[in-house]
């Protein structure tokens, strides 16, 4: 079976700005693959090249064996797209929007069944402007699925949703895959990527730095633990840089974050800091996760926006 997506040395430039820089990867049928990275990393531009919304400046792309830059009507019926920014007329009702989109396809999904599956059947007669953020997202997902796509693109699906709505949307993504579709998604949310994705790619400054399973990405850090703590006053980097078994030290004001080769080191680290004067509080020790992978590969936290 051919890959659902094949990307080879893809670039997209805007004058001197390189938004996507030599990206290559493949996605197999039935996979959920996530791309993580901060705003401005190039994730959305990359997806738009795969969706046929932007033309690459270089390289090649095949999506379901078709070049998205030269799409056919039949190809468009095989993909579903949930854009990062989307809108509907405020006075359109949910059922009206569903009927409108269904009319564009020869063999659409049953709109009532789709709304039921997504948990918004009770809102079919509601105006879009009256829906909550989570309900609107479900409507946009329903519209993206109304053509029974083989491949679904989800761009920042849960941005600005409350925790309950976010978890509900995770169930929606799982149901999409259970229905046989392939999913390529972007997200800022490390928990979301870990919970949903078979493989995760780290994107920064237009480049795909790595793409692998979450266990493999975390294992690449070599084990150990992440230690976070607060100090009563700022601590010079030099206090911690010389400690054996300590790496990736990040000091931001009175917050210290570092990696240790052992979970038994916190007291030694605390002692080293307090010998210089500051007191230590709020010590947290945890196993490495995707945030640590991102920090190690890019040298910055996911929360440090471009």
Where are these regions (language model features)?
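ABC-family P-loop ATPase nucleotide-binding domain
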Residues: 1-11, 300-306
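ABC transporter nucleotide-binding domains
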Residues: 3-5, 12-204, 210
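Hydrophobic/anchoring residues in structured secondary elements
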Residues: 37, 248-251, 285
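ABC transporter nucleotide-binding domain
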Residues: 169-261
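C-terminal coupling/interaction segments
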Residues: 261-306
